[in-house]
Amino acid sequence: MTTRVVLGSASSGRLKVLRQAGIEPLVVVSGVDEDAIVAALGAAAPPDQVVCALAAAKAASVVESLPTEVATDCVVIGCDSMLQLDGRLTGKPGTPAAARAQWQQMAGRSGELYTGHCLVRVRDGVAGRREVEAAATTVRFGTPPPADLAAYVDSGEPLGVAGAFTLDGLGGWFLDGVDGDPSNVIGLSLPLVRRMLDRLDLSVPALWTR
């Protein structure tokens, strides 16, 4: 029997990363209150702790709602990403005004994109071993002309992504580069997930669906 991969995220970027890496996951979106978790941790919580707590909460929520036939043998992947700039963590801007302000702050500078990952091994309907870890990648932002920034914000893309930018979409035009793992910037670090799967005694090739 093939172990099924379950992605606990609505992120099209994370789904694309897995698909391009040979895995067609089942997508089960969690109903986690992210703001409540961040508030409970407090402003002084380290960024890796914050994203790992969010990823773990998402994975736990998804485990509880797995279809019976999938819970027989699967691994759940929960992720969450946030950008740290000037010691402050930011998630999805949500509004055009917030996205515009975010870009005005980070244009021409560098920030750290943190992604928390939580993998839960589920067999015979029971959640077993769990791995939780974060990865960080430095992102170097360009300085888009005002008209370009306005067009990008108007596209709607930056409103629903951590840090108000994407590497693999329209936002990629306005990045000068990344130092580290690019898949982590998209929202799921393939090198880290491979190591976490190995610790769960799961082989990456055995999970390929093509």
Swiss-Prot record:
Its cofactor is a divalent metal cation. GO terms for cellular component: cytoplasm. The active site is at residue 80. It catalyses: a ribonucleoside 5'-triphosphate + H2O = a ribonucleoside 5'-phosphate + diphosphate + H(+); a 2'-deoxyribonucleoside 5'-triphosphate + H2O = a 2'-deoxyribonucleoside 5'-phosphate + diphosphate + H(+). It is found in: Cytoplasm. GO terms for molecular function: nucleoside triphosphate diphosphatase activity. InterPro entries: ITPase-like_fam, Maf-like. Keywords: Cytoplasm, Hydrolase, Nucleotide metabolism. One of its GO terms (biological process) is nucleotide metabolic process. Its main location: cytoplasm. Its EC number is 3.6.1.9. Belongs to the Maf family. Nucleoside triphosphate pyrophosphatase. May have a dual role in cell division arrest and in preventing the incorporation of modified nucleotides into cellular nucleic acids. HAMAP family: Maf. This is Nucleoside triphosphate pyrophosphatase. It comes from Mycobacterium sp. (strain KMS). The lineage of its organism: Bacteria, Bacillati, Actinomycetota, Actinomycetes, Mycobacteriales.
